[in-house]
UniProtKB/Swiss-Prot annotation:
The gene is BIP103. Keywords: Cell membrane, Coiled coil, Membrane, Transmembrane, Transmembrane helix. One of its GO terms (cellular component) is plasma membrane. It is a single-pass membrane protein. Residues 45-60, 411-424, 434-445 have a biased composition (Low complexity). Induction: Induced by brassinolide. Residues 28-40, 455-498, 505-519 have a biased composition (Basic and acidic residues). Interacts with BRI1. Residues 253-300, 468-519 form a coiled coil. Its main location: membrane. Residues 28-70, 394-572 are annotated as: Disordered. This is Proton pump-interactor BIP103.
Length: 627
């Protein structure tokens, strides 16, 4: 099995050369180089300065002081090889994380859509409130104006009430007595005349005398009542003026109330709209709360899955931190610490490699991709030309199951136009299909509500969540379509009823016209002789025969029309439009006018004579007896 290592170079220490030290450059120098150096030193020198034995001075043969800069020593590099642990992603866990991220993004988008809807409703609500404020101020002004006018009219009404109470008191006081002295005198005089000029019994005369005495007793009351009435009559002008003022103020109040009512109607409409918007905002707020809860739950699932991924790659993260620390120590030339860190890491890796089979399998999985990319075999050898690449076992992610779109309710018109299915389903099969569909719908709804959690390998993918706002819009469009179709049906029914009513009215008018014609014929025929009646009967018979001849060809299209109506409208009961048979009335023999006019005149004359006799005995005889 191959092992992947990472080399770390420690910065070498600088080599400093002093005068007392042995120059390594001079020790390693070859003789040829020394000879050349000696010749170079002796070249151009004065022979007089040489020693007697011809040897040069050792100090003159030493290298110059800047030799270290011209010929620097090769820098020594320390290399330490650490074991590298690569990142490995679990395909199942990666698929779950991707699905959880998609679900989380969908929840965020759904919440943002609800936010936008709430924002739009808030703007609409703000517009309605801005319209309500001036209307409320105007309504307040109208209320103040009405209250001021009511305050102004209150004392006038009190004054009129006082007049009314006084008038009622005077009327109650003068009830049963004469209204004035003149009327009292006339009543007394009439009774006296009756006593003196008429022949009446004694009891009647006593009764009349008693009435005269009672009238005389009421004279003081009549005088006081007439005086009070005179006083009230003096206040009539003032009362009329007050009534005029009350009328003018009342008209002003009525005008202000009409304007206020118009403003209040506008305010009521806006308040109803505001209440509807508040209700919609409340429902949207509930949807937002639910969306926030779903988003938080999806985020928790995603965080848990990410923690699981981090726990699965904990060895990779630890190795990454160790390598970063080693690079940091190497950059600071801390050789001992790098060496100690290297030894500790390698010893630990070897111990785990020898003791744990799971560690070996995990490390092998992690390094396979690196070996494959470097064209190496499993044991780290160079791959032979005929050797196949290393097969990395990875489970392919299952393709996402496409969720079937929600079938919205079709309008009635489209449902009628849609063709019927070819295969007919029996009632038993239909009930079985419905029974299977109910648990599947419940399961899909539970899966849609639950957020992404740790799934078993056999768990089915969850269907996509449907947007709430989109569903509401679809339902609203369906309701509008239903209302439109209902209105069309009502219009058609109203048109049919109107047509039937018009036909019925036309038939009634024709019947009435026929009745009038028959009555006119009866009246005209009553004065004719028997000869004329016979001629009329003949003419009626001829007219009837002609009508029957005319109705015979017309009956054919009528029957055809009835057949067509029966053929195309099965459920509609058609009425026959064939003309009804004409009724022939036999005329009675006319009676003579003088046969009943003479007796009637005699009876009337007898009644007039009887009434004249009764009037004479009732009126004229008593008057003559009294005179």
């Amino acid at each position: 099995m191959g092992m992947e290592v990472v080399g770390t170079e420690a910065a070498p220490a600088e080599v400093k050369v002093t005068d007392g030290e042995v120059n390594l450059f001079q020790e390693n120098e070859s003789k040829a180089t020394a000879k050349e150096r000696e010749e170079a030193v002796l070249f151009g020198s004065d022979n007089s300065t040489a020693t007697a034995n011809g040897a040069a001075n050792g100090a003159d043969l030493a290298p110059p002081k800047d030799a270290e800069e011209d010929w620097p020593e090769a820098r020594k590099t320390h290399s330490f090889f650490f074991v590298k642990i690569r990142l490995l992603e679990d395909p199942k866990l990666k698929m779950k994380i991707d699905q959880a991220e998609k679900d989380f993004q969908k929840k965020i988008q759904a919440r943002s859509q609800i936010f936008e809807a709430i924002k739009a409703k808030k703007n609409e609500r703000f517009g309605i409130i801005s319209e309500l404020k001036p209307l409320a101020a105007e309504n307040k002004q109208y209320n103040e104006a009405v209250s001021e006018k009511l305050k102004a009219i209150e004392p006038l009404r009190n004054r009129l009430g006082k007049f009314r109470d006084e008038n009622n008191a005077i009327r109650a006081q003068g009830a049963g007595i004469c209204s004035s002295i003149e009327e009292l005198e006339k009543s007394i005089k009439r009774l006296n005349d009756r006593i003196s000029h008429e022949s009446i019994p004694l009891d009647e005369e006593k009764r009349l005398i008693k009435q005269i005495r009672e009238l005389e007793k009421t004279r003081p009351k009549v005088i006081s009542t007439s005086a009070n009435r005179a006083q009230i009559q003096d206040t009539v002008v003032e009362r009329d003026a007050i009534q005029d003022q009350v009328k003018i103020i009342g008209e002003g109040i009525d005008g202000v109330k009409k304007e206020r009512q118009a403003v209040r109607s506008k305010i009521k409409v806006l308040e109803d709209e505001l209440k509807a918007i508040d209700m919609e905002m409340g429902s949207l707020q509930e949807d937002l709360t639910a969306a926030n809860a779903r988003k938080d739950k999806a985020h928790e699932s995603l965080v848990q899955l990410r923690h699981a991924r981090d726990a699965y790659n904990a060895s990779f993260h630890q190795n990454r931190q160790l390598l970063s620390k080693a690079r940091d120590l190497a950059s600071r030339s801390e050789l001992a610490q790098v060496q100690e860190l290297y030894k500790t890491q390698v010893d630990k890796f070897v111990a785990e490699w020898c003791n744990s089979k799971a560690f070996r399998e995990d490390y092998e999985k992690r390094i396979l991709s690196s070996l494959n990319s470097r064209q190496l075999s499993r044991d780290g050898r160079m791959r032979n030309p005929d050797e196949k690449p290393i097969f990395i076992e990875t489970e392919a992610a299952a393709p996402p199951v496409e969720q079937e779109p929600i079938q919205s309710k079709m309008p009635a018109k489209q449902a009628k136009e849609a063709p019927a299915p070819q295969a007919e389903v029996s009632p038993k099969d239909e009930s079985r299909v419905k029974a299977i569909a109910k648990p599947s719908k419940a399961k899909s709804s539970l899966d849609a509500d639950d957020d992404y959690e740790a799934e078993s390998p056999k768990e089915k993918p969850k269907p996509k969540e449907v947007d709430v706002a989109k569903l509401k819009e679809i339902k609203r469009q369906e309701e509008m379509e239903k209302n439109r179709l209902a209105l069309e049906r009502k219009k058609k029914l109203a048109e049919k009823q109107a047509a039937k009513a018009a036909a019925r009215a036309q038939k009634e008018a024709e019947k009435k016209l026929k009745r009038e014609e028959m009555r006119a014929r009866r009246r005209a025929g009553a004065a004719d002789t028997e000869a004329s009646t016979e001629s009329d009967n003949r003419s009626d018979g001829a007219a009837e025969a002609q009508a029957e001849d005319d109705s015979a060809p017309a009956s054919a299209p009528v029957m055809r029309e009835q057949r067509e109506s029966v053929r195309y409208s099965r459920n509609v009961v058609t009425k026959s439009k064939a003309p009804l048979p004409k009724a022939i009335l036999r005329r009675k023999k006319a009676q003579s006018y003088w046969s009943w006019a003479g007796p009637a005149a005699a009876v009337a004359a007898a009644l007039v004579a009887l009434l004249a006799v009764l009037g004479y005995y009732q009126y004229y005889l008593p008057a003559s007896a009294s005179n």
